C-alpha cells in the first residue's frame, strides 16, 4: 500500500511538473506576442499605406534620393561594376498588405525575436543538409580554423537577395583565399502559393519536401557556382536559430558571430559585408592602393 501511495505521489509530481513547464512556456509565448505585436502593427500599417501608389512612389523615391551617392567602381576591363545594393523595386501591380504578406511578416519578426544568434555571442551550430545525397551536417562544419565564415541566407523568390547575388559572388571571388563562404537555402520568401510578388525572378511554390528545396537551390547554384551551398532543414532549424527569414548575412570567426547583418529586405546590405571584408583584408595584408 505504501509503495502504491508513493507511486501515485510520484506520478502526480511528474504531472504537476509537466503542467508547470507548459504554463511557463505559454506565459513566455504570450509575453513575446505582446512585445512583438506593436512592431507588427506598425509594419502592417506601413504595408497598407504602401498599397496606395502615390504614397508608395513618394516613399520609395525619397528613400532612393536619401541614399548616399555610390562611388563608381570599374573592373579590370574598365567596365562599370553594378552597385552592391541596388535599390529595392516594387512594381505597381503588387499588393503589399494581404493576409499572406502579414503572415510572412509575423513569421519573420517572430524568428528574429526568438533567434539564438547575436553579434559577439556564440554561433549556433544548427543543422543543414547537403543537396547531394541529403546528408545532415552542421553550419560550423564549414568553419576552418581561424578563417572567417560568411553565411548568406536566402531563396530564389526574394528579389533583393537575387538582385545582390552578383555582388556577393564578386566578394567570394575576391576574398576566398582568406575567407570561407556558405549559402544556406531557406524557405521561399515569396512562394507562388503564398505572398506572391511579380518582382520575383522565379515562380516557386512552398517546399513540401527536401526534394522541392534542392530543386529550388539548384537554380540558385547556377548563379553562384564558386560558393558552397547547403539546405536548411524542413523544420527550418538554421533560419530559426539565426532569424534569417527573408534573407540575412552573418560572419562567424572562431565560433563567435563577428557580424550580424540586418534582416531583409531593408537590412540586407552586401555593402556592409564588403566593408567588413576590406577591413579584415587590410589587417592580414595591409592597405591596398586604390585604383584611380
From Swiss-Prot:
The lineage of its organism: Eukaryota, Metazoa, Chordata, Craniata, Vertebrata. Monomer. Homodimer. May undergo minor heretodimerization with DIO1 and DIO2. Its main location: membrane. This is Thyroxine 5-deiodinase. It is a single-pass type II membrane protein. The keyword Transmembrane applies. Residues 1-30 are cytoplasmic. The chain crosses the membrane at residues 31-50. Keywords: Cell membrane, Endosome, Membrane, Oxidoreductase, Selenocysteine, Signal-anchor, Thyroid hormones biosynthesis, Transmembrane, Transmembrane helix. It is found in: Cell membrane; Endosome membrane.
